[in-house]
């Protein structure tokens, strides 16, 4: 009975978010602001996560990092509700709901230190029931080496099907959007988030396991949560971050905050083979 009640409460809260309730001071991310439609040949690792309401509705993004594993944000699937039967995965799709071929999950692994997105460890792994066939249209994104820092000013890309502005949902036919964003140094990002707060500068908001990117014209937003932030390094696309949280979307002095992939590589590789 308790489990059923928790599931009902979780589903109702998810439904409320899908009809765009008023934003909180810090929002888990849902869309692309200041971007444009992606071409069909780009971002072959992009994933749409689905939850069953009247139909399998998109609620978060993700990335294929191995033929049988998807990387996403913990707040999309946890911390309490982890039954894989509740979710489906749609691999690279130009327009949401057009030609769906939904895939079932075998298990969901949420980082054990996750409690809220703002608290960090906002990362989860989804194991597909069956490995996908890798092709030019669908293939994994490479994870970075632990030594990769993605220095401030690096131009990266974030993709998703979320809001295109604060409280402005992506309109039909729901195209995959992309936006180019600059990496923002963590200490600068932390200072920006302390502006107007009374927590004191010695209370960290942006932790080591986080990465900041974006500006007042370009950012991820609500619906993009769990999706990839990718950067091209020496000719190879690497996933630098996972869309996590932020204050509003493309707000002045409030970059988007991402889970820093390199910080969690050891945990990821406990489950995901390093070479597919």
From Swiss-Prot:
Entry GO CC: extracellular region
Disruption phenotype annotation: Mutant mice do not exhibit any visible phenotype when maintained in pathogen-free facilities. However, after peritoneal inoculation of Klebsiella pneumoniae, they cannot efficiently fight the infection and show increased lethality.
Alphabetic keyword roster: Disulfide bond, Glycoprotein, Hydrolase, Phosphoprotein, Protease, Secreted, Serine protease, Signal, Zymogen
Domain Peptidase S1, chain residue ranges per copy: 32-273
Propiece residues: 22-31
Subcellular localization: Secreted
Active site: 75 (charge relay system), 122 (charge relay system), 225 (charge relay system)
PROSITE patterns according to UniProt: TRYPSIN_DOM (PS50240), TRYPSIN_HIS (PS00134), TRYPSIN_SER (PS00135)
Signal peptide boundaries: 1-21
Superkingdom per UniProt: Eukaryota
Swiss-Prot/TrEMBL catalytic activity: Preferential cleavage: Arg-|-Xaa, Lys-|-Xaa, but with more restricted specificity than trypsin
Protein name: Tryptase beta-2
Entry keyword Iron: no
Enzyme Commission number, as recorded: 3.4.21.59
Entry's family note: Belongs to the peptidase S1 family. Tryptase subfamily.
GO biological process terms, semicolon-separated: inflammatory response; proteolysis
Expressing tissues: During embryogenesis, detected primarily in skin.
Residues carrying Phosphotyrosine: 98
GO molecular function: heparin binding; peptidase activity; serine-type endopeptidase activity
Summary of the function given for this chain in its UniProt record: Tryptase is the major neutral protease present in mast cells and is secreted upon the coupled activation-degranulation response of this cell type. Plays a role in innate immunity.
S-S bonds: 60-76, 156-231, 189-212, 221-249
Gene designation per UniProt: Tpsb2
Nucleotide-binding as UniProt keyword: no
Subunit structure: Homotetramer. The active tetramer is converted to inactive monomers at neutral and acidic pH in the absence of heparin. Low concentrations of inactive monomers become active monomers at pH 6.0 in the presence of heparin. When the concentration of active monomers is higher, they convert to active monomers and then to active tetramers. These monomers are active and functionally distinct from the tetrameric enzyme. In contrast to the hidden active sites in the tetrameric form, the active site of the monomeric form is accessible for macromolecular proteins and inhibitors, e.g.
Residue positions with a glycan: 133
Organism of origin: Mus musculus (Mouse)
